[in-house]
């Protein structure tokens, strides 16, 4: 009997795959990730360019955040990431504060504010973040932060996580645009 072909079902939650990459990394690998962090603001602007309010109010998947909430989440998350890096560079294994991203995404501003506000935040944070990342000494990427939920993470791990995070959420938006023909 011939084998039945199963359709490959794409997991809409993870359009670029789940985050699995952990350090330590080479300087070349770090440089590539830092370039990706630097490109993220333009990628988000391109992802939402020309979308109207109804489109921005569309969830990227059933049960998921709207495109608007996704952009606001990235601003919230990457502001926290920038602070976590600064703490990791300047303190001995600091404990970083988690936040309830799901609750934050349901706040009024995350559901209704124009995406341009958070795109501006993403622009500014990423410029400062890249300036910081480009000056971190190789040995300092081995420094750790303690996250109450995720345990000990090196700055290499944080860099990889947030580089992935930017691509992950930009792909949520671009994948919906492709599926919807926008």
Task: Describe the role of every protein-language-model region.
Residues 1-20, 57-103, 127-131, 138, ...:
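Short, contiguous alpha-helical
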Residues 11-36:
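Secretory/endomembrane lumenal or extracellular ectodomains immediately following the signal peptide
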